[in-house]
């Protein structure tokens, strides 16, 4: 029996790369609902073992999963309205005026406001009628994830309060806050902060359900970690010592690559580079937490690009 198990474990396996956003859905973008379960069933019937996805962090204004507002948070656009209805966190009538989208393309400019309207409505229902069990679940989530969630929620609430501007354009006290100043802003933006925590609570609730469904059907999920983070992110705003930045917060150098096989003119990514000496002093704590968080969500991870740990370019 042991020999049979070894043979089975060493057999070749296959999988498919499919971004969750690309799954067919009536909501203009793929979700963590029935369309994800249908795809898992397809993989199971096809004898596949792996579902590889792109990063599922909240995207910035370029809609790229490799330029996210957080390396730890989940993408709100993936939340399924149908699952919200099942949980009593949305009503069917709330979708009556939801736009009809072309199923062949994703028009983020139209999808984002429509989806955010639904999510804000769900938050209102949660505040008005969530039962004690769900409220307790929410509190437990916030406590368990506070290591990144508190800064992320304040960061996003701060962006809303400043018309979506990059944190480098905020007033000095919130751009460079100490703990006392953070407490003042947390009180000032309390409802907006709780909204962003609620959205993450719902995202991870739905994500965990999809991950468990995949496991029941013999499918393992391969996640994706971009090696660099966006300048306009909670990660940089709240952890400036981790990056090569000037005193005013702007990068001293940024990421990119010279001309190569993929690009005749090279690529200027613009991400701030890590201060690896500082990471070493902290025993790479931030990276350890980042990888641990991802492995709590998926079975395997791909780092894009892994070679960046050994060699990278710095562009002034």
What is each residue range found by the language model?
Residues 14-18, 51-52, 221-223, 301:
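Hydrophobic faces of well-ordered beta-strands that scaffold small-molecule active sites
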Residues 31-42, 283-293:
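Short, acidic/polar
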Residues 196, 200-229:
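Conserved, well-ordered alpha-helix/loop/beta-strand core segments that scaffold catalytic motifs
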Residues 34-59, 297-298:
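Catalytic domains of carbohydrate-active enzymes, especially glycoside hydrolases
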């Amino acid at each position: 029996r042991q020999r049979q198990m070894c043979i089975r474990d060493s057999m070749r396996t296959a999988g498919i790369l499919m971004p969750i956003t690309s799954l067919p859905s009536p909501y203009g973008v793929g979700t963590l609902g029935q369309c994800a379960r249908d795809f898992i069933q397809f993989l199971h019937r096809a004898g596949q073992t792996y579902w590889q996805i792109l990063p599922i962090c909240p995207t910035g204004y370029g809609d790229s999963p490799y330029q996210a507002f957080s390396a730890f948070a989940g993408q709100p656009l993936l939340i399924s309205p149908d699952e919200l209805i099942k949980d009593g966190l949305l009503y069917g009538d709330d979708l009556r005026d939801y736009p009809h989208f072309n199923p062949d393309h994703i028009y983020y400019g139209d999808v984002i406001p429509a989806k955010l309207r639904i999510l804000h409505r769900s938050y209102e229902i949660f505040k008005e009628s969530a039962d004690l069990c769900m409220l307790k679940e929410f509190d437990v989530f916030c406590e368990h994830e506070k290591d990144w969630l508190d800064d992320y929620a304040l960061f996003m609430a701060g962006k809303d309060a400043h018309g979506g501007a990059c944190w480098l354009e905020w007033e000095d006290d919130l751009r460079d806050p100490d703990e006392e100043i953070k407490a003042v802003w947390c009180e000032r933006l309390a409802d907006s902060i709780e909204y962003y925590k609620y959205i993450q609570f719902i995202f991870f609730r739905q994500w965990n359900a999809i991950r468990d469904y995949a496991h029941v059907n013999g499918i393992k999920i391969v996640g994706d970690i971009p090696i660099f983070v966006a300048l306009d992110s909670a990660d940089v705003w709240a952890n400036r010592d981790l990056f090569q930045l000037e005193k005013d917060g702007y990068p001293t150098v940024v990421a990119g690559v010279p001309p190569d096989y993929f690009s005749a003119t090279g690529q200027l990514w613009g991400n701030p580079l890590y201060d690896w000496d500082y990471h070493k002093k902290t025993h790479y704590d931030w990276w350890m937490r980042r990888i641990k968080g991802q492995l709590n969500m998926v079975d395997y991870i791909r780092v894009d690009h892994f070679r960046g740990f050994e060699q990278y370019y710095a562009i002034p």
